[in-house]
Each structure stands twice: as structure tokens, then as C-alpha cells.
Curated annotation (Swiss-Prot):
This is Phenylalanine--tRNA ligase beta subunit. It comes from the Bacteria. Mg(2+) binds at residues 466, 472, 475-476. Binds 2 magnesium ions per tetramer. It is found in: Cytoplasm. It comes from Porphyromonas gingivalis (strain ATCC BAA-308 / W83). Signal peptide: none annotated. Its cofactor is Mg(2+). Tetramer of two alpha and two beta subunits. GO terms for molecular function: ATP binding; magnesium ion binding; phenylalanine-tRNA ligase activity; tRNA binding. Residues 42-154 form the tRNA-binding domain.
């Protein structure tokens, strides 16, 4: 949320700088994202002055340029070459002197001394669009004859500067979603620090001569709409807002529309209460009904989009039941205020947060009004906001005030909380004087209605929807008192619990994340929601096993993901289009599946399952072309190495798992990682060409998806040990094997480890050959076997016995032949 510095000072006059205010707000829990200086005209018209054109002659080398001399109040006139068709001697103009920076959209350019068609030019005579004071670019600005020569253009155009403070409001602090709300917290902090701070709310005085004009209001459900107020104003003039109002809205990033709409927006950001103005001519029967409508009713909102309503959407309707506005969310196209409007009905209401949130999400509308209503507003605050807006409308747009309607069926009682000074000190951890506690509570508008034996009975304002318990009040006291005022004691009390399984999993996630980042990977975070269309036609992840959303935000986000793959492909595609061609990514996330067969009336949730996974993507170049190394693309073998390193890091060593070819339609070719007992730990391989083409990716993508729950379960069976460096030498033996092309190295490694579990340390493939001089359907593998005994040096007899056993096994199981 954006806060204007000057606007804020209207409610809390103080001498703090914008940055000091931002720092203070952050210290009391209203964290600020930054402070930005803004001006009503970009650049503040610095370097521009009012000039008087003394002479204007045609350029000798051009048929459209003019050579002018312009008095800008300096020691001598400036010679300026100008291309505007309307420039003439005697005019008062706006001149950009040398060194001035002008802005056009996102572009900017500096005025320099130049030579145009052989004639020197020492500035520029400007048009409206060039300096940002209008939209005309047909010629130079011609000012009135009494415009003072040499006056800075910023002074002539009344350029104002301000500071925009970005405040990050947490969802529970709806009371701080306005300038007055922020000022209230700031005042409390200043008072706590001994700085005089008087919070001022503008007085509202409405005329007593009210015309006989009133709208009848009927609320169908007081729970859906606890309070609805409105009044009529006739004979208004809709037009442009005054400069001060436009400046206030522009300072916080809002676009002025017209004086009526601007006033409702102004009061919203001033006091936090949303308002809506209806064109009275479109309220049929002079009656407003707050109700729901029939399922499927079409409704065109202010943005011109037709939306289908449901029977749960709360609407503002006319006497015929025709919807005019989505309550608390968005107005209708045909009932809003236009330049032709002369009479209005001004609404200030309170709507049920749950209903507003549900409707706003379903319709895909996130407005300033819904943002506040969703968090819960105080029905008592509608009245002041309505009167304030009516007062401003009468002042700015004229008109005559009609009657007010107020439907408030069940006025809320004050929320009472009991709190002792003893508990305040106990929870905070230090003694705070009762007078300080009372002062802080008073500054937060929390009234002490009773105090007896050190126990206070507090009346909490209804707008503080987040303060419902005594500990919430203590948090408020602590927030204003200052967390940095509470020093650490000489001892720390804490409970040290045993490491839970959840703790263990998070610990290993951190360890593996650090390992991957150290290897050059970047962590990504994708949405758990995905497009159901991704799963159409897949056998490994069929569409019918997707968890569908009942009310999706869009068709691109209509189901929960079954695999991490597609989110990563979206990220890869996005970055590849921006010329980031070599990408190493990983992601932690949950995946979800629906098993219809497991669903019963007694256990409806048994059909749903979720599990944690680790996704790893590799794409692009492993080594870029340089003087030292030729270019080398990534490969599935690089991904395989990463997978093995992750498994090793969590304690699952090479011999504890097997790699087998997988039939998975996500991949062009893939391997499954399984335990010796056949439990699946993950899958990796080359992503299917058809899939990557759907994401407009034109280079191979290698993807691994590890089942983290299964990995953690398996790793718990092994104990990580720190070992001494081997004291005895390692022996290497090589075999050149002739094999069928279908045989994988993983099969060779697995069989070899089965032959010798104790002494065989590593199995490595160092050469592959396929081609001439080999029988059809055959290939040659050159494999190294590394043997070591940690207790003594191996002798030739032991080595040969092991190697003979390995050779025999490979011959019998794989049909291998020694070359």
C-alpha cells in the first residue's frame, strides 16, 4: 500500500522526514518497502524557464526550421533552432536550456548544444507533450503575454513534490490500510518516545437544509450485510477534480477519473472505508435491494467484461432485482457515474468478509474495496466516511443534499478484554510502568473502561479485528513500546525437544539445497496449481488422477500438479526466450494425486494423496566455448551424476540402489532409481520431445524427479560415517566386454556389486564403442573395477578370484564376451 508523505501530515503534523517516518513505521510492525520522491510532473520541470521569442527567421538550409532568438532572463538571448510550425516572434514560450533532461514515457534525453543544418542551437522550445503538461504535440506551447520571462517553469506550472512510502500491510492489519490508520500508529509511537503528536481527523459539517429525496434500502440478510448506509445528492456537476485532489491520488499511484469517483477513492485511502457512487437515474423504483441473484445471471462490470453470477454472490440491485454492483468488489458498467450524471446515490456499507472474498476470487477481481472488505471492516465507520465524502462532493461538485438511509439491524457491542499489569510484564519479560501501559493503550484508542486491583477491563475498537485476546493487547503494547527496549536477560529458558521426522526432512532439504547451489544450480518455486490440459493423454500421470479445483481462477490453474516437471518447463521456456540458454534448476514441492477407487462414504479423503519431491532440470551448455575448452553440451549422464551425488549425500550409497530402464511417457528415455527391494526412489532422463515443443523449447531438457518421502525413509536405514583415508592401496582391473546394445552399464555395475560386496569399491565405464568390426546388434564397453581391502593389501590370488567371478557372472547373465 502506498502512503503519501504530505497527505499523512494532514492528520499528524510532525517534523519527521519521509525516511524517518518509514523507519518508525517499520519498527512498530508496519514494514516499509521503500521511499520514493515523486513530482506532479515527471522531472519537476527542472532546467525549463519561461522565454520571450524576440526574433524568428526561416532557416536558410531547411524548408520547415526556424532560427529564433529567445530571452530567458539571462545575460544574453539564446539562439534556438525550432521546428514547430507555430513559433513566431513575440510569443511567450517554455524553453529547455542546455543540460535539461526531458522525459517521454520511459525514455529520457538531455538537451545539448548542437548544430542543426549548420546553425548552432542552445536549447529547445517545447511542446506540451515534451514536458508532460498536456497531450498536444502540434507545436510549441504559447503562454499568455503576462507570463514572466525567466520564471522557472516548475513555479509557473505549480509543480509539487511529495514522497511515496510503500507500506507492506499484513493481512490482519486492515485498520492500517489508510492514511489515517497509519497516522494513528505513528502518533502512538511518537507519544511513546516523548514527541508531541496530535492526531487530527477532519471535521465534517453537512448542510441542514436537506431536500426531500431518499432511496429506500432493503437488506435481505443482515449477516451478509451488517450495515448499509446511503444518501442522495442532486444537481451535481461531474468534471475534472481540483488540482489538490488529483495530486493526492497520483501521489499514491491512482489515476484521476472524475471528481465524484476521485472523492470516493480519496476517502477510501484517507479513512479505509470503501464507498460507491451510483447514477441515480439508473436506480429503478428508487429502491436498493442488497441480495443474491439467480444462478447464471449475466452482469457487465465497469471494465466492460460480462461475468456470470452465482446464487452466492451478494449484489446491489434495483427494485426490479436487476444487479447494479457486486457488493464490496466492483461496480456495474451501466450504473456508474459518467459526465452526464446529475444525481447520485452514495453508498457506504459493511459486507461479510467471507462472501466478498469468495466472490472476488471466483470473478478474478482484486480491487481496493475487496482488499479491505475481505479482511473485515468495522460497521461503525461507515457513517463518518459517508458524511466526509458527501461534504467533499458538495464542496467540489456542488449539488443539494437529500435524505440519508441507514439499515443497521444488529449494532455491535464493544469488545471487552481483561488484562492485568502482571501478565503484561510476565509476557514481555520486563516491568513496564502502569502509566506507560495506559498511555500506549490510549494512543491506540483502546479504552480502559474499568481498572481494579491491577486488572484492566479494555474496550477494543471494532476496527481492530486482530485484537481479540489479552495476549493480542500485550503484542500491541510491545509493538509501540519497542522490541528493542527489552534487553536479553542473563539466562535463557528453552525446551530442547528431540528431532522429529519433519525436522530431519527439512534439515536434509537444506543440506541438499546447499549441495546443488554449490554445483551451480538455482532454486525455483512454482505454483502448485497447473493446467489440467498438461495431463491429457498421459499414461504415467492420467488426467483422471488430477485433483481438480471446484472454482479455478483460470483454465491454466484448474488442478493440482501431479509432477514438478511442467512448472519447471514453464520456467525454462520463460528464461530461454530471454536468452538465458544454459539453465541448472531445482525445486522442492508437493505433488498431488486422486485415486477414485480408494474413496468411500466413510473415508472421502482417502482418495487424495500428496508427497514431497525434488525436481532437477538441466538444459543448455555444460561448458561454454573458450580458448581453454571447446563447447560441451549438457547430457543425461551429467544429470545421472547429480542424482547419484544427492543419493550419496543423504547416505544412500551406490550399492544400495539399482538403475533400470523406465517406460514413462514424460521422457524420451528414462531410468528408474529403485532400492534393492524394488521401492521407487525417483526417475530421471531426457524429457519427451513432444512435451518440450509444447513449451516452445528447442533444445534437449534433462529432468530428474526424486520422491523425497521415499528417499528419507530409505536413508534412515543407513548411518553416515566419517572414515579414515585408506591405509592400503586400491587395485584397478579393466575388462573390455562385447555386449548386446540393449545392455546398460547399470546392469553391469549391479551384477558386479552382487558378486563382491565387501572389496569392490567402484565400477566405472571409461569407453564405449559401436561401429564397424563388431557383430550386428553389439557394442563394446571398457569397464574399470576398483578393489581394496581396508585391513590388508590384496594379493594376486584374491584379485583374480574376484575378477573371475565377475567375468563368469557377466557371461552367464548378460551374454558378455571378453574382447
Amino acid at each position: 500500500m502506498n502512503i503519501s508523505y504530505k497527505w499523512l501530515l494532514e492528520y499528524l503534523p510532525c517534523t519527521l522526514s519521509p525516511q524517518e517516518i518509514a523507519d518508525t513505521l517499520t519498527s512498530i510492525g508496519l514494514e516499509t518497502g521503500g521511499v520514493e520522491e515523486i513530482e506532479t510532473i515527471r522531472g519537476g520541470l527542472r532546467g525549463l524557464v519561461i522565454g520571450h521569442v524576440l526574433t524568428c527567421e526561416e532557416h536558410p538550409n531547411s524548408d520547415h526550421l526556424h532560427i529564433t532568438t529567445v530571452d530567458v532572463g539571462a545575460d544574453a538571448p539564446l539562439q534556438i533552432v525550432c521546428g514547430a510550425p507555430n513559433v513566431a516572434a513575440g510569443q511567450k514560450v517554455v524553453v529547455a536550456t542546455v543540460g535539461t533532461t526531458l522525459y517521454h514515457g520511459e525514455e529520457e534525453f538531455a538537451i545539448k548544444k548542437s548544430k542543426i543544418r549548420g546553425v548552432e542551437s542552445f536549447g529547445m522550445i517545447c511542446s506540451e507533450v515534451e514536458i508532460g503538461v498536456g497531450s498536444s504535440n502540434d507545436g510549441t506551447i504559447v503562454l499568455p503575454s503576462d507570463a514572466p520571462v525567466g520564471m522557472p517553469a516548475a513555479e509557473y506550472y505549480h509543480v509539487e513534490s511529495d514522497y511515496c512510502i510503500e507500506v507492506d500491510i499484513t493481512p490482519n492489519r486492515v485498520d492500517a490500510t489508510s492514511h489515517y490508520g497509519v497516522a494513528r500508529d505513528l502518533a502512538a509511537s511518537l507519544k511513546r518516545n516523548g514527541v508531541p503528536a496530535e492526531l487530527k481527523l477532519p471535521e465534517v459539517n453537512l448542510p441542514t437544509d436537506i431536500i426531500d429525496s431518499r432511496i429506500e434500502v432493503k437488506v435481505a440478510d443482515a449477516t451478509a450485510c451488517p450495515r448499509y448506509q446511503g444518501l442522495v445528492i442532486r444537481d451535481i456537476t461531474v468534471g475534472e477534480s481540483p488540482e489538490w485532489l488529483r495530486n493526492r491520488l497520483q501521489a499514491i499511484g491512482l489515476r484521476p477519473i472524475n471528481n465524484i469517483v476521485d472523492i470516493t477513492n480519496y476517502v477510501l485511502h484517507e479513512f479505509g472505508q470503501p464507498l460507491h457512487a451510483f447514477d441515480l437515474a439508473f436506480i429503478k423504483g428508487d429502491r436498493v435491494h442488497v441480495q443474491t441473484v439467480a444462478e447464471g445471471t449475466p452482469f457487465v462490470t465497469l471494465d466492460g467484461v460480462e461475468r456470470k453470477l452465482t446464487a452466492e454472490d451478494l449484489m446491489i440491485c434495483d427494485s426490479n432485482g436487476d444487479p447494479m454492483c457486486v457488493a464490496g468488489v466492483f461496480g456495474g458498467l451501466h450504473s456508474g457515474v459518467t459526465e452526464k450524471t446529475t444525481d447520485i446515490f452514495l453508498e457506504s456499507a459493511n459486507f461479510n468478509p467471507t462472501m466478498v472474498r469468495r466472490t472476488a476470487r471466483r470473478l478474478g477481481l482484486n480491487t481496493d474495496s475487496s482488499f479491505r472488505f475481505e479482511r473485515g471492516l468495522d460497521p461503525e465507520r461507515t457513517d463518518w466516511a459517508l458524511r466526509r465524502a458527501a461534504s467533499l462532493i458538495l464542496e467540489i461538485a456542488g449539488g443539494h443534499l437529500g435524505g440519508m438511509t441507514d439499515v443497521y439491524s444488529n449494532p455491535l457491542k464493544p469488545h471487552l478484554i481483561s488484562l492485568s499489569f502482571e501478565k503484561v510484564n510476565s509476557v514481555i519479560g520486563r516491568t513496564i510502568e502502569p502509566e506507560m501501559v495506559r498511555s500506549i493503550l490510549n494512543s491506540l484508542e483502546i479504552r480502559i473502561s474499568k481498572e481494579e486491583d491491577g486488572v484492566m477491563t479494555l474496550e477494543v475498537p471494532r476496527y481492530r479485528t486482530d485484537v481479540t485476546r489479552d495476549v493480542d493487547v500485550i503484542e500491541e503494547i510491545m509493538r509501540i513500546y519497542g522490541y528493542n527496549q527489552v534487553e536479553l536477560t542473563g539466562y535463557i529458558r528453552a525446551s530442547l525437544g528431540h528431532e522429529t521426522e519433519t525436522d530431519r526432512r527439512y534439515k536434509w532439504q537444506t543440506v541438499v539445497s546447499e549441495q546443488l547451489v554449490g554445483a551451480g544450480f538455482n532454486e525455483i518455486l512454482n505454483n502448485s496449481l497447473t493446467a489440467g490440459s498438461y495431463y491429457e493423454g498421459l499414461k504415467s500421470h492420467p488426467r483422471e488422477m488430477a485433483v481438480e479445483l471446484m472454482n479455478p481462477l483460470s483454465q491454466e490453474l484448474n488442478c493440482m500438479r501431479q509432477t514438478l516437471l511442467f512448472g519447471g518447463l514453464e520456467t525454462l521456456s520463460h528464461n530461454l526466450r530471454r536468452k538465458h540458454l544454459s539453465l541448472y534448476l531445482f525445486e522442492w514441492g508437493k505433488c498431488y494425486r486422486f485415486h477414485a477407487a480408494k474413496r468411500t462414504d466413510e473415508t472421502p479423503l482417502a482418495a487424495y494423496a500428496e508427497d514431497d519431491r525434488l525436481g532437477i532440470w538441466i538444459c543448455g551448455q555444460r561448458v561454454h566455448n573458450s580458448w581453454a575448452h571447446p563447447e560441451e553440451p549438457t547430457s543425461v549422464f551429467e544429470l545421472k551424476a547429480v542424482v547419484e551425488q544427492v543419493l550419496c549425500r543423504v547416505g544412500i550409497e551406490t550399492g544400495a540402489y539399482t538403475l533400470k530402464t523406465a517406460d514413462n511417457d514424460l521422457y524420451a528415455s528414462a531410468m528408474e532409481v529403485k532400492t534393492r527391494s524394488g521401492k521407487l526412489l525417483g526417475t530421471f532422463g531426457t524429457v519427451s520431445t513432444e512435451l518440450i515443443k509444447r513449451f516452445e523449447i528447442e533444445q534437449p531438457v534433462y529432468f530428474a524427479e526424486l520422491l523425497w518421502d521415499a528417499l528419507m525413509s530409505e536413508s534412515a536405514r543407513y548411518k553416515l560415517e566419517a572414515r579414515d583415508l585408506p591405509r592400503f592401496p586400491e587395485v584397478k582391473r579393466d575388462l573390455a566386454l562385447l555386449l548386446d546394445k540393449a545392455v546398460s552399464f547399470a546392469e553391469i555395475e549391479s551384477l558386479a556389486r552382487g558378486c563382491e560386496k565387501k572389496l569392490l569399491r567402484r565400477v566405472e565405464l571409461f569407453d564405449v564403442y559401436e561401429g564397424k568390426n563388431l557383430p550386428a546388434g553389439k557394442k563394446s564397453y571398457a569397464v574399470s573395477f576398483f578393489l581394496r581391502n581396508d585391513e590388508k593389501t590384496l594379493n594376486d590370488k584374491q584379485i583374480e578370484a574376484i575378477m573371475a567371478k565377475i567375468r563368469t557372472t557377466l557371461e552367464q547373465k548378460l551374454g558378455a564376451q571378453l574382447r
